[in-house]
């Protein structure tokens, strides 16, 4: 379960105070699929980044499965984040790594053997229908293929929670439908 209690996020832009989030209270149950909608600049991405503390809220608490993330040290937070997959709008793939290496990257700090990592990568490549592209580099892929690599990477650690920040916004309608079906299947 995810609970957000009185989450606020304040930025300062050239000395001017900007309240991106103000007293947000939400809760999400396991298995629930929730969409956050709003105008451009409304704070949707900021809210998602506050959930996994990629951006700490200015005030408030983020509680996941009874653990208050705001109180954790860096090491504890890294462990929790292994169970939170994040799919970004702009893929965030490493250009100098093959698709396989991009997908295996989150498993680097795990206790899995090389063989187990390779097997997990193969499973994920099959899931996102990119087995034949495993030795390709991001520059050799279409936007939809890059997004599928991003999804596979987000799923590498078998997360309990998947956060998607406009995961289909730059895709054509056919690829969008494929990605949404894939995310529903994973759920």
Residue ranges and their predicted role:
Residues 67-68, 108, 114-132:
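Conserved ABC ATPase "signature" region
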Residues 158:
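Conserved catalytic motifs of ABC-family nucleotide-binding domains
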Residues 97-104:
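Short coil-to-helix segment of the ABC ATPase nucleotide-binding domain corresponding to the Q-loop/switch region
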Residues 60-68:
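Conserved ABC transporter NBD signature motif
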């Amino acid at each position: 379960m995810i609970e957000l209690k009185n989450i606020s996020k304040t930025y300062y832009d050239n000395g001017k105070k900007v309240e991106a989030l103000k007293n947000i209270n939400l809760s999400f149950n396991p298995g629930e699929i929730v969409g956050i909608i709003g105008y451009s600049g409304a704070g949707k991405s900021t809210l998602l980044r506050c959930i996994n503390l990629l951006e700490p809220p200015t005030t408030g608490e983020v509680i996941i499965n009874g653990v208050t993330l705001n109180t954790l040290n860096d090491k504890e937070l890294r462990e929790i984040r292994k169970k939170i997959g994040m799919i970004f709008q702009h893929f965030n793939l490493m250009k100098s790594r093959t698709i396989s290496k991009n997908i295996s990257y989150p498993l680097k700090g795990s206790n899995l053997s090389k063989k187990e990592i390779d097997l997990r990568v193969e499973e994920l490549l099959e899931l996102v229908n990119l087995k034949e592209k495993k030795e390709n580099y991001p520059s050799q892929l279409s936007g939809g293929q890059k997004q599928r690599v991003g999804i596979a990477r987000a799923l590498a650690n078998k997360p309990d929670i998947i956060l998607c920040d406009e995961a289909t916004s730059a895709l054509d309608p056919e690829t969008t439908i494929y990605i949404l079906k894939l995310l529903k299947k994973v759920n």
